[in-house]
């Protein structure tokens, strides 16, 4: 039955209780009998500062090329229509006080789910434990926070359907709510101003506070300055830290406006501030003068804003750690001393820089009272300063496409668009390296770039590089060239213009690419130095390539690359590498080739619709230069009956895959490999991961194995942490390792997000926000089960020895029993049939125990709500799993092993060995448990065929000979090979671990 509102409010925090009150008011206003999840969504979308509202607006801005307000309005309409469909209750005229509509069972179930999720969340695990210990006398009720309340509401099937009708995905909304981007808390401010509406005469007055202000190029006020002023006027967290590539420009605009006496954008209570700028690098150069500098700052007048500039130097290794720590502590003490009259302001170019700063100084945001302020756009925009028509849309917005898409000239693009944080870091590294050693490019920085981005140094310039340290003018003359170089690289590659060039018509490939059973294609080339086998999925074409007219459709594609002349002289140094690379001008802008490369390389390509494979560092040079054939032979020997899967895995791991298929929107070079192993054969998948650990990581000590099925069991490894937390801790201790993740489809939503993020960025983030580098790590993720299409034929015939029975075989001792033939004929067959019948009954009971049951103690509504919740969670997991499999470096499907055929071969070999000792006239009975044990040992052995033959000759054959000696020649007898259920097998001490070390003769 429904729950009273007062009872439900006791389980919520103040913020969540206010959201529930808004939902109750919506239900009361519509005269609904109960308060449901839809009412809660309606109330959250109405609140101006709601997390759900900001996330939806931010997600709409990223998903649609149109106005984000239109899609958000569509969501509001869908919610309103769904609420209109709910029946209204008729209030009695005798009631004088209107009662609150009680909380429905579905909404109360969402609150309970929120409590469970929040209780087991690692971030609050220790806090709940301390809270429970301090309140032992009273029963403590876990207060549900608003974030977890929203996550549970989004799991409601009705809410998911409404969001889907409006063009949203509940999984995306949950992702943004659980791990919001840096800009999420301000999305309601800048998203509405990122698109300037049409200019009407009625829009010109700015008396309405909620109206968007137009950022005219000649205006005195700047939107970013106004936002900075709002932060400075706060009581807490009043020191803004500008985050973004445009943060430096916004900071400069703010300081220039203050210095010119323009305070119109500041609130009245802080009007009249003064700005004092300091350069952190100059202060840190002489550590002894830090105290003197801060003494001077302490004597300044009140109302001062201390401009710290770019804070990247605090996270770098240029200066001593002790000096930087002293500087940070001095600033914190200065702020505590003059809290009411002193402000800080600074900027970082990217979120990564801020995370590095937090990693080095975890409490700097509290000590400096920082407030993150994202700067997503420049005040100038993409329009020239002299153009008023840049923000004007003719005909009242009827032709809005002209304002949404403008093609700026190349000169304006070069002036207004800054470099991205990656190119900016590379530029600064080159400047630092050139200033220190006189080298134009740092070797470590250059090796991380593809060969077509490496700078070319002419020979006649080498003599002038030694003058850098002596003459500072040389460095000053080099800096503009470096700036132009990286501006060109960034704008050509990382910053795509609004329209492509008219001379280039993008066309997507019209043919599917497949590899075996994994939807991939092989491209084979000539000799070992010219052979490249490339794997590519159909979704790998993130960029668009120009195709020739009427390309021939071929199922198998071959590409031949002629061997350059200069590589013949270097053949001795390249024989160990299975790859040969060529440099091709892809029309991406200025090409910077390496020094040892010739300007042109002859290339003969039969199919021009493939991109040329580029060089990439994977794990290490020696690691991925392993011979493909050697790895394939090793895996084939250790993992039998999976030849196609072994070939595909060897190709992927050895680097025979398409470089452009790496993570979407992933610029930085990652050197980890992600494999997805689908289908059955659990033992074969694990043996593949163990073999990769032996080959690439030096042994099984660097093998990390986790199972998402065991996260709910009593496993000490996961106490107080999640599976991803355990993986992050192990990878931090063992950098070069193979991570084997079983049943990845069982991962919970937070772990799903972290795994997807680690695959994109190359860094695994635990539940506490710490990032662990996944460099030099091979991740092998398995998915239980297999495709339905590939398993349809398996269900046609009953299977006697299934994979589940084989892997669950007991570790019983094998025995050879000698019995009189008469007794065997009387008792043997009946007893054997009885034992087999008992085994079938046990398996049938186990199957029945796994079926769902009906709990009569639960109301019908709650059972239906739980079923809907389970269905929604399963649907969300399937969607994430499909995306996860498509993003990995390679997916390989294992086929089902015919254990029945293997059992026949095992029986045939045992009988042949038996007849050598007893003769063909003697009968041997073999129990099913014996076959199951041998099958399990055979599948888990390192070298299946060799190990089984060795066990037959060294263990079973001597036992048969010993049994033959005990037999009485005159009396008729029969021999049984059984598995003793009384005594389990002891730990093996021989080299054959899985097979029994001895077979008893009774």
From Swiss-Prot:
A Pfam family reported for this protein in Swiss-Prot or TrEMBL: AAA_2
Recorded GO CC terms: nucleus
Superkingdom to which the source organism belongs: Eukaryota
UniProt key word Cell membrane: no
PTM comment: Ubiquitinated upon strigolactone treatment. Strigolactone, but not karrikin, triggers rapid SCF(MAX2)-dependent degradation.
Main location: nucleus
Annotated stretches, region: Repeat 2: 103-185
Extent of motif EAR: 854-858
Keyword set, alphabetical order: Nucleus, Repeat, Transcription, Transcription regulation, Ubl conjugation
Tissue specificity note: Expressed in axillary branches and roots. Detected in seedlings and leaves. Expressed in the primary rosette buds and expanding leaves of adult rosettes, the vasculature of the hypocotyls, cotyledons, and mature roots, and in the midvein and petioles of young leaves.
Disruption of the gene: reported phenotype: No visible phenotype. Suppresses max2 phenotypes associated with strigolactone-D14-regulated growth. Smxl7 and max2 double mutants have reduced branching and increased inflorescence heights compared with max2 mutants.
Inducers of expression: Up-regulated by strigolactone treatment.
Region (Repeat 1): 12-86
GO molecular function annotation: ATP binding; ATP hydrolysis activity
Location relative to the cell: Nucleus
Positions of the Clp R domain: 8-185
Assembly, per entry: Interacts with TPL/TPR in an EAR-motif dependent manner. Interacts with TPL, TPR1, TPR2 and TPR4. Interacts with MAX2 and TPR2. Interacts with D14. The interaction with D14 occurs in the presence of (2'R) stereoisomers of strigolactones, but not (2'S) stereoisomers.
Family indicated by similarity: Belongs to the ClpA/ClpB family.
Role played: Probable component of a transcriptional corepressor complex involved in branching control. Regulates cotyledon expansion and lateral root growth, but not germination or hypocotyl elongation. Promotes auxin transport and PIN1 accumulation in the stem and represses BRC1/TCP18 expression in axillary buds.
Domain notes: Contains 1 EAR motif required for the interaction with TPR2.
Protein name: Protein SMAX1-LIKE 7
Annotated organism of origin: Arabidopsis thaliana (Mouse-ear cress)
